[in-house]
Design a protein with these regions (language model features):
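Basic helix-turn-helix/winged-helix DNA-binding cores
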Residues: 1-65
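C-terminal regulatory/oligomerization modules of transcriptional regulators
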Residues: 68, 72-124
């Protein structure tokens, strides 16, 4: 699959795909004999992984570290596990904070909706 096709499939720019590869967020992509990127299923798996992890807010550095560990072989499985466990905990912490914020917004929305109906704003 060409970089253009991958770009269209995942709605991500070609420049971003090149950047991800250049900084190590995805391993080097398979290339044709003339040096053109030729994304294979394994390459697409890495692209999907990066898109998912970035959309979850994982730091670029953590994604790069994970890719590096994967490339070093099975002896890094414990380190990969630890990295993923830490990132999962970070995501759970973020979700908890977002839930607190959501509750506060719900409360304020409720107060303002009541104020629109009654003509009076109350924080009781």
């Amino acid at each position: 699959m060409t970089i253009k096709e991958v770009s269209e499939k995942y709605d991500i720019s070609q420049d971003t795909l090149r950047y991800y590869e250049s900084i190590g967020m995805i391993p080097p992509v398979t290339r044709t004999s003339s040096g053109i990127r030729d994304y294979q299923e394994s390459d697409l798996g890495w692209v999907e992984h990066v898109i998912c992890m970035r959309s979850a807010g994982l730091p670029v550095e953590s994604i790069i570290e994970y890719v590096k560990l994967c490339q070093e072989g099975d002896e890094t499985i414990p380190a990969r596990l630890q990295l993923l466990v830490e990132q999962r905990k970070n995501l759970l912490d973020q979700m908890e904070q977002m839930n607190v914020t959501l509750k506060r917004l719900d409360y304020k929305i409720d107060r303002y909706e009541t104020a629109v109906k009654t003509g009076e704003l109350s924080w009781d």
